[in-house]
């Protein structure tokens, strides 16, 4: 099967699939049409870049399936239409690129040095104005706080208090919360010193590592 360099038709097919799966927000769909996912994977994975599947990106990690990213982005847009966003878990850099395409000011943290280096190089090559750093994402980025939204791309065992403290008043934290086997996508909204929780669908993410994540040796 032959592809053009931009893989426009494949990208349109992916967006149509997301629409059939229930993603309705036009901003989110437009962002997925704009960002070239195949530039965030390497080798043979590129031919599957616009399938709705997770793909290996090295270092034992994967790029999330498009539907999962779109689901989180739709929750974000519906709860925080603009502003400053912190992403926990840069991975390939694809979701940060989507956030940028949505018009947010993006900060992202990765704990795996190799992934951080690859993603940073992609951002520079593609001209994506994302601020990235290597470190423990569960501790957030206090020097840049507060954030209008924080997105966590790995399964959290409990509410990460440090991240919650870095939300602006009215800000939202979106994360998969639960066990190692299954997590509920959760939106936590800050209202002054109170935090409101709302649960959505269930997913299966890799575990969140760090001081407020899962221990390295599972449970």
UniProtKB/Swiss-Prot annotation:
EC number: 2.1.1.77
Source superkingdom: Bacteria
InterPro entries: PCMT, SAM-dependent_MTases_sf
Reactions catalysed, as given in the entry: [protein]-L-isoaspartate + S-adenosyl-L-methionine = [protein]-L-isoaspartate alpha-methyl ester + S-adenosyl-L-homocysteine
CDD domains documented for this protein: AdoMet_MTases (cd02440)
Keywords: Cytoplasm, Methyltransferase, S-adenosyl-L-methionine, Transferase
GO molecular function, one term: protein-L-isoaspartate (D-aspartate) O-methyltransferase activity
One Gene Ontology biological process: methylation
Catalytic site: 64
A cellular-component GO term for this protein: cytoplasm
Top-level EC class: transferase
Cellular compartments annotated: Cytoplasm
A Pfam family reported for this protein in Swiss-Prot or TrEMBL: PCMT
Family: Belongs to the methyltransferase superfamily. L-isoaspartyl/D-aspartyl protein methyltransferase family.
PANTHER family: PROTEIN-L-ISOASPARTATE O-METHYLTRANSFERASE (PTHR11579), PROTEIN-L-ISOASPARTATE(D-ASPARTATE) O-METHYLTRANSFERASE (PTHR11579:SF0)
NCBIfam families according to UniProt: pimt, PRK00312.1
Job description of the protein: Catalyzes the methyl esterification of L-isoaspartyl residues in peptides and proteins that result from spontaneous decomposition of normal L-aspartyl and L-asparaginyl residues. It plays a role in the repair and/or degradation of damaged proteins.
Protein name: Protein-L-isoaspartate O-methyltransferase
């Amino acid at each position: 099967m032959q592809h053009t360099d931009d893989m426009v038709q494949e990208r349109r097919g992916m967006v149509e699939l997301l629409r059939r799966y229930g993603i309705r927000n036009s901003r989110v769909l437009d962002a997925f049409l704009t960002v070239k996912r195949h530039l965030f994977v390497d080798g043979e994975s590129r031919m599957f870049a616009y399938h709705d599947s997770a793909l290996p990106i090295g270092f034992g990690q994967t790029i999330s399936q498009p539907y999962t990213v779109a689901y989180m982005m739709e929750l974000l847009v519906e709860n925080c239409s603009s502003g400053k966003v912190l992403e926990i878990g840069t991975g390939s850099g694809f979701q940060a690129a989507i956030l940028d395409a949505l018009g947010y000011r993006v900060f992202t943290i990765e704990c795996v040095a190799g992934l951080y280096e690859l993603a940073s190089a992609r951002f520079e090559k593609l001209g994506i104005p994302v601020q990235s750093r290597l470190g423990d994402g569960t501790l957030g980025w206090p020097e840049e706080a507060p954030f209008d939204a924080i997105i966590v791309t790995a399964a959290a065992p409990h509410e990460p208090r440090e991240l919650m403290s870095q939300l602006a008043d009215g800000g939202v934290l979106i994360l998969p919360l639960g066990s190692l086997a299954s997590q509920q996508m959760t939106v936590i909204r800050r209202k002054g010193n109170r935090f409101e929780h709302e649960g959505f669908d269930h997913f299966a993410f890799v575990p969140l590592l760090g001081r407020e994540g899962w221990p390295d040796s599972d449970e």
